[in-house]
Amino acid sequence: MKVAVLGAAGGIGQALALLLKTQLPAGSELSLYDIAPVTPGVAVDLSHIPTDVTITGFSGIDPTAALVGADVVLISAGVARKPGMDRSDLFNINAGIIKNLASKCAEVCPTACIGIITNPVNTTVPIAAEVLKQAGVYDKRKLFGITTLDVIRSETFVSALKGISLADVAVPVIGGHSGATILPLLSQVKGVEFTAEEIATLTTRIQNAGTEVVEAKAGGGSATLSMGHAAARFGLSLVRALQGEKGIVECTYVDGGSEHATFFAQPVLLGKNGVEEVLAYGDLSDFETNARDAMLEELKANITLGEEFVAG
């Protein structure tokens, strides 16, 4: 199993590469790519960690060498948020980066599963889909927006608020991956009761958690380490499913036939071909139903923006 990380010299990419080097199954290959010249050195640094995962690093303008034979491609390339920016401010730079990298994936590893971390995910995933369609290699089972960070934040915040073990907390998160499009289904957390005020406060905190980190880092970066962990969790789940492990479910932003929007995040059963089944997300509270319905105009506009970017 070969996993490629594109954007591997950045804050997310390095954290992700470290976790993959230590946690991928024995015999896996890990290839790192970034435009930054430091990337081969990152691979050398990680190669000194004693695990049965071989690692190579490539830099420059062409990611081809990193993509040859890849089964999974995780893309974190792009610029990060700074104070005062929201995810949509990233669009102007990151849209072109994703378009180019998706085009290379279509050319070099057309059957690979692609997980997109680069924000704004609501828009960058549709960009990748349109590029893959134009190349004639689009398989909607193999393209994912990685929204796992919203899930782990939800679980962390619920655990802290209620004083319960994280092992006992599972929070599905649906919709998209920015602001009001992030909808944690707190009504589905088993064995926990929330007041209406707690639900409103928690939901807002989860939706704005990225800004919390950007402001706390005071211009020194965005949520790189927690995002690296979230991307590793998703990537490792995907690898295990591709290798035949059954019953692996992750929330992820996919082209899954949702009644709400072309792309929508919800629980997905992963399998040997990527998406095995998009699962129903179950019953919502009135608060959640209203929040879902209220987000759809923004989410659909984000998707259209990506589609139109590729169409020119």
UniProtKB/Swiss-Prot annotation:
<dbReference type="GO" id="GO:0006099">
    <property type="term" value="P:tricarboxylic acid cycle"/>
</dbReference>
<feature type="binding site">
    <location>
        <position position="34"/>
    </location>
    <ligand>
        <name>NAD(+)</name>
    </ligand>
</feature>
<dbReference type="InterPro" id="IPR022383">
    <property type="entry name" value="Lactate/malate_DH_C"/>
</dbReference>
<comment type="similarity">
    <text>Belongs to the LDH/MDH superfamily. MDH type 1 family.</text>
</comment>
<protein>
    <recommendedName>
        <fullName>Malate dehydrogenase</fullName>
        <ecNumber>1.1.1.37</ecNumber>
    </recommendedName>
</protein>
<dbReference type="InterPro" id="IPR001236">
    <property type="entry name" value="Lactate/malate_DH_N"/>
</dbReference>
<feature type="binding site">
    <location>
        <position position="87"/>
    </location>
    <ligand>
        <name>substrate</name>
    </ligand>
</feature>
<comment type="subunit">
    <text>Homodimer.</text>
</comment>
<dbReference type="InterPro" id="IPR015955">
    <property type="entry name" value="Lactate_DH/Glyco_Ohase_4_C"/>
</dbReference>
<feature type="binding site">
    <location>
        <position position="153"/>
    </location>
    <ligand>
        <name>substrate</name>
    </ligand>
</feature>
<feature type="binding site">
    <location>
        <begin position="7"/>
        <end position="13"/>
    </location>
    <ligand>
        <name>NAD(+)</name>
    </ligand>
</feature>
<keyword id="KW-0816">Tricarboxylic acid cycle</keyword>
<feature type="binding site">
    <location>
        <begin position="117"/>
        <end position="119"/>
    </location>
    <ligand>
        <name>NAD(+)</name>
    </ligand>
</feature>
<dbReference type="GO" id="GO:0030060">
    <property type="term" value="F:L-malate dehydrogenase (NAD+) activity"/>
</dbReference>
<keyword id="KW-0560">Oxidoreductase</keyword>
<feature type="binding site">
    <location>
        <position position="227"/>
    </location>
    <ligand>
        <name>NAD(+)</name>
    </ligand>
</feature>
<dbReference type="InterPro" id="IPR023958">
    <property type="entry name" value="Malate_DH_type1_bac"/>
</dbReference>
<feature type="binding site">
    <location>
        <position position="81"/>
    </location>
    <ligand>
        <name>substrate</name>
    </ligand>
</feature>
<dbReference type="InterPro" id="IPR036291">
    <property type="entry name" value="NAD(P)-bd_dom_sf"/>
</dbReference>
<dbReference type="InterPro" id="IPR010097">
    <property type="entry name" value="Malate_DH_type1"/>
</dbReference>
<dbReference type="GO" id="GO:0006108">
    <property type="term" value="P:malate metabolic process"/>
</dbReference>
<dbReference type="GO" id="GO:0005737">
    <property type="term" value="C:cytoplasm"/>
</dbReference>
<dbReference type="Pfam" id="PF02866">
    <property type="entry name" value="Ldh_1_C"/>
</dbReference>
<dbReference type="Pfam" id="PF00056">
    <property type="entry name" value="Ldh_1_N"/>
</dbReference>
<feature type="active site" description="Proton acceptor">
    <location>
        <position position="177"/>
    </location>
</feature>
<keyword id="KW-0520">NAD</keyword>
<feature type="binding site">
    <location>
        <position position="94"/>
    </location>
    <ligand>
        <name>NAD(+)</name>
    </ligand>
</feature>
<dbReference type="InterPro" id="IPR001557">
    <property type="entry name" value="L-lactate/malate_DH"/>
</dbReference>
<dbReference type="InterPro" id="IPR001252">
    <property type="entry name" value="Malate_DH_AS"/>
</dbReference>
<comment type="function">
    <text>Catalyzes the reversible oxidation of malate to oxaloacetate.</text>
</comment>
<feature type="binding site">
    <location>
        <position position="119"/>
    </location>
    <ligand>
        <name>substrate</name>
    </ligand>
</feature>
